[in-house]
């Protein structure tokens, strides 16, 4: 099944030994804390159906998903984002609507982050000499992300790990509550970079958010790709592990110089 789209299958056995297969959209599934299917019932009659495992999408197993219905429900950007995130091209993609919903939540969070920032005071330009430790750490993660995403997409063609890095960056921005002049400058730099880095995967949302950030209507593909600032990657401190009798007891931060 390498490189194929696969999905869960559900069925009931008929009296003659044949199987009647039900589309996953028509089945209510129960899962454990690890996301594994523990039970399933047909939505129309509430009666149990058997779990047939994960198979290549096919008419015979009735486990296909209509892409148009998913696009109509979640939008083309969300479906594309899930498809690129769920598996690298050389591996099989397991279709999971819960995963699509997760991508929709990520994009909604990103939209809220950008619009909330755009609704605040005007931002300054980042002045590296004026940044405090927290601002430097946030900016370092931004430029580490630019470096990773550029390599993942440009050299490795690994969109899934690039998207994961952008999710981590958004989580960090959500915790970065610095509303000072330089804090807002760092946030603005990060949000602009995220819009450009996500543009190959979610072009419609990226185009809209680029305008929210104050830019005129333009073709984002004509914008320069974010560049890594080598100075932003430099760490002022190093984390050292403290071990006693071979067991980790804590960590300490020490100046690099």
Task: List the predicted regions and their residue ranges.
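Long, charged, mostly alpha-helical binding arms that flank functional sites
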Residues: 1-185
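Basic, alpha-helical terminal appendages of large translation-related enzymes
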Residues: 57, 63, 93-96, 174-185, ...
